[in-house]
Regions:
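A solvent-exposed, acidic/Ser-Thr-rich amphipathic alpha-helical stretch
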Residues: 30-34, 51-102, 111, 117, ...
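Sequence/structural signature of outer-membrane beta-barrel proteins
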Residues: 115-117, 150-152
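Short beta-strand edge/turn micro-motifs at domain boundaries
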Residues: 126-151
């Protein structure tokens, strides 16, 4: 009889654990889709020079490191966009985008091809990109991103 009780308790515990993992995986999958949608919105805003949307997407303490290794704040990026110093003609993403969710933080890595200029300097080329997104009351916002040029080997 004791053995049946132990087996029953063990089975219930395993089922409960499996359900918790399933709920967490579903939450991560939903968050990943939200991040991917926000990335599309972000890229469209960059291409259309939509400062109002970028103002919402970038956190107040946002930092961008461009392919030349220069860092820029949210205010600097917006000023470059409004002045025309930053102007992108196209952004295409390779199929290798990876979105990793860690609670209210998402880390996104990918390979991108950009045509245009950043901060008044030609920036056309291929890059490895890393973006760090945080989810707060305003939804998913970009807190930091960096582009690293891909060079031929």
């Amino acid at each position: 009889m004791k053995q049946i009780i132990y087996v029953t308790i063990f089975t219930v515990a395993l089922l409960s654990l499996g359900r918790q993992q399933s709920v967490a995986q579903n939450a991560d999958a939903a968050a990943e889709q939200e991040v991917r949608q926000t990335i599309k919105k972000y890229r469209t805003a960059l291409l259309q020079k939509d400062a109002a949307t970028l103002e919402q997407i970038w956190t107040d303490d946002y930092t961008f490191t461009n392919g030349a290794g220069e860092t820029h704040t949210k205010a600097e990026r917006l000023a470059h966009l409004k002045s025309g110093a930053t102007s992108l003609d196209s952004i295409s993403e390779a199929e290798d985008m990876k979105v990793r969710i860690h609670g209210n933080v998402a880390v996104v890595t990918s390979r991108v091809t950009i045509k245009g200029q950043y901060s008044g300097k030609q920036a056309s080329g291929q890059y490895r990109s890393i973006n760090v997104w945080v989810k707060g009351a305003a939804g998913w916002q970009l807190i930091a991103n960096q582009l690293t040029p891909v060079t031929a080997k």
